[in-house]
Amino acid sequence: MEREELKRRIEEAIDQEAEALMAYADDIRKHPELGFEEYRTSDKIAEYMKSLGLSVTRNLAITGVKGELVSSDKGPHIAVMGELDAIICNGAPYADPQTGAAHQCGHNVQQTVLLAIAAGLIRSGAYKELDGRISFLGVPAEEYCYLEKRLQLKEEGKLHFMSGKAELIHE
């Protein structure tokens, strides 16, 4: 299949998924969670990945999620990442009143873009035209804040690194 036709099919599939994707982004924005505490977010992204037919692995680097799409054993293995955590930003619109967590860095949008890419490739069938494997990674605790929690997890032997991204790669 020609490249332009693949692109057209992917764009069409994403357009058809737009309402669900926008609802996902809005839901995550309204329920921000701090690093290594993204339990609800992790549940939501895993649920969406499963609805697309991805093989999902949970609890990576504590709250991380991986969805895998394999088109063939040959070819590259690439990753698409979307960060799960929020930052502390008291007073921001949709900040959690108890934790002050808010998606001021747009991680809810990153997650949605990750899901849009997956949906576009899967729903269009375009992934069947490609070689290789794609891992869609929901990355925990990317923002380097809330250090007390990270130090505690490290002391408990639950982390090797203070960064969720480094921890996810380590696993």
Question: What are these regions, as identified by a protein language model?
Answer:
Residues 3-104, 108-135, 140-143:
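Acidic/His- and Gly-rich active-site-bordering loop/insert found
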Residues 139-171:
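Fold-level recognition of mixed alpha/beta catalytic cores in primary-metabolism enzymes, strongest
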